[in-house]
Amino acid sequence: MRLIAHLLPLLLAGILPSYAKDEATTITSAGDGALVLTGSITTSISEATLPTGDYLSYTSTITLSNDHTTGTSTRVGVSTITDASSSGNATATTTSSRSSTSSNSVTLLVGGGHHTMNGTANATSTSTTSATSTPVVNTQPCNGYSDFCSRKYSNITMVAAHNSPFVKPGNAAANQAYKVTDQLNDGIRMLQFQTHLINGTLYLCHTSCEMLNVGTLEDYLTTVTTWIKTHPYDVVTILIGNYDYVDPGNFTAPVQNSGLMDYVWTPPKIPMALDDWPTLSNMILSGKRAVVFMDYQANQTAYPWLMDEFSQMWETPFSPTDAAFPCTEQRPPDLSVQDAKNRMYMANHNLNLDVSIGSISLLIPNTAMLNQTNAVSGYASLGRMAENCTDTWGRPPNFLLVDYYNYGNFNGSVFAVAAEMNNVTYSGTCCGTASAAPIVLPGPSMLGTLFVVVGVSLVGWMF
């Protein structure tokens, strides 16, 4: 029996053809965009259940040594980052004898005087100070805003692209309209996706590689690395979904071969509490500007750079179908309020439809509500959820996870919400240069109807 080849590929256009096809299934057209399936469906595919796995907890903090970096890299460059409250400057030259060596010449505007420093990796230094009356104002943005340079990584709200690589015209399993380079150019600073291990190679697939396979993890990370190389003042977060719960060692080769390892940031301790994170300027000056998390099976003892998500970040309800978007903690389960307040958190704001056909259960983006879901205000809006989370937890979410970030009540509305949470003003342009996967926004009328005759009945919204 052949595995299902196509299930629901044109929901975005208001027509939902079959993604379920085997030798005992026949598909006929009823005209006017309607489709009739007859026969039997024997393959079981399910994404409409809450992912779960082993959740790590620590009774004490583990301090990491400085020799945990994998691979060797050399960086030589000059950077200038200034703080809005700074009134002086410092020049530092640093060399390192670690396996990952670096040689930097850095101009950093900090403090209240003119400092010249010479230091080594053992943190010993000498300095000379001379008074200056010239005030210095930061003009170099970090992650798009000069105010962010002096802020801790854990004190910034970032927009996250849910299933970032899944860009495919006319495929219901797609979650974004623009490819990753456009996403990063527009202001996305977290890239989230799921991986599947097939014959020793990690692929980016949505639920099943027969449903949507957009290529290898290595190719995707190579594109991301190219962007990071050319944007030296940006910190990018990557959240890997380990769908098959494979050993974390499988992820080392794609990260190394893509060149990303040269930029991967490694925490000084495990786990990282809310106040343990460095500032963006610290990360930028170190050259380590890629923060990598994995949801399940992370082993930071063996791979310190591949950080366990749920011991350092919690999430609101997974793939929500409730437009009220409650800001309650769901994963990891049974987390105390005190522990939740002491780590970062992500607001899942990607509204879904739960579609079931026989033994197939899928969560697909509710495209009918995209303009409202990604809006700055109103019922079901990203803005309202962000405000609710801030009121509930006393601080804004660190990450706002969204589908089709380019839609909302205006172009860039999701970034405007993040800017409000960060107490800055969004003035960017959005979105993309040319759509990599144009979608048809649902209109007010019904464009298609699906009839399924497999012993079950499905009534779906086709807009």
Question: What is the role of each PLM region?
Answer:
Residues 2-463:
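Catalytic cores of phosphodiester-bond hydrolases, prominently lipid phosphodiesterases
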